Structures are given as structure tokens and as C-alpha cells.
């Protein structure tokens, strides 16, 4: 998860830190053995009219559930006298906006250690973070089209949304390979109001100002 860290919200989407103005405070809320997907609407996965942020959040949560279920079944299938381990699933809430689910298994008969972690975070990126992000993403600021700093600043930051799934699996068998992959999605949105308090004519809750996917394996 993102952890209760400092004013640095790590958007690993750029393999760097993007500094936010407010501290990140997470609270662990529940501990279970499986992620809860009872509120997921899987129909949005194939709905091209649904917002991509909704589809991607649903996808990473559903994939996490499938992976944890399959790994637990594999762990339970041991037949050489060892006691299978169980996943510990912790759900956390980010006070500044967002949530996550961390699933960890360790010291098992099949898996030495494994984790499948989902993060869904949102809030406002300050101008400094937007400028840093723009430098690494092909003049993003110019493409978004807002003046963010100086006396003529139109906005004092931009709303953002980020979600992703990160998975690391270390089998107990030294002949079995370690697996590591992550899927990520990030978007910047048009603010509802400009810095001077007037309505933003470009605001559309379903049309991000910029978005991209990331990840690797």
C-alpha cells in the first residue's frame, strides 16, 4: 500500500516521487482472508461508455481477487505434510482520498512470500508536482493547457486519479522463478472551478485532461 508516510505521495507511475502539499494518512480498517469484491460491477469491464478510471479500478480489484484465490488454492493443495499458509488481507483508507487492499502470504508450503496489492488514490496535484510530471511526459502541461504558476495562474493545481495492481511472488522451490508485475493507470482532470472561483468551461467529470497506462513485468 502507500503507507502512512510523509508529504510524498509516491506515484510509481513515473518511477519517481511526486510531492504533495498535504500529509498522507492511511488507516487500516479490516483484516480478512480474501479481498471483498461484493460491490464490484464486472459489467463495466466491457462497457466502452464507462469512464476508464472506473473500468481500470474494477479490473485491478477483480484481477487481485483471482490471483489471491488461485494462489491460495495452490497453497492448500500441498500433500507432503506441511501446513499451508493463508493470505492476510488488509483494507486501508487514505484520508486525503482513496483506498487500497494489501494481500500478503508468507512462510507457506508452496510460497515463501507473495503479495498482491491494489491502490486507488485521488486528490489534487500542486503546481510543483504538475511541472515535474510535465518534464517527464512530453510537455504535458502545455498539452493540458493551463497556466499553473505566476500572477496569471488559472488553476492552483489539478485533480488526479491513480490506480494500480502490484504483484510479487516468491515460490518456496528455488527452481521456480520469482514473478513481479504491475499494472497502472493515471489521469489528470479539469478542475470544476478556476483559481479565481469562476466555473471552468473545460470541466467534464467524464473527460480527463490527460491519461495514460503504465506497468511492467
Language model region names:
Residues 1-21:
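Terminal signal-anchor or tail-anchor transmembrane helices
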Residues 119, 123-217:
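Aromatic- and glycine-enriched beta-alpha-beta binding-site module
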Residues 48-153:
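Gly/Pro-rich turn-and-neighbor structural signature
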Residues 39-54, 214-217:
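Charged, low-complexity surface segments at secondary-structure and domain boundaries
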Residues 4-10, 26, 64, 70-74, ...:
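Generic ordered-secondary-structure signal
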Residues 16-43, 47:
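C-terminal segment of N-terminal export signals and the immediately downstream linker at the start
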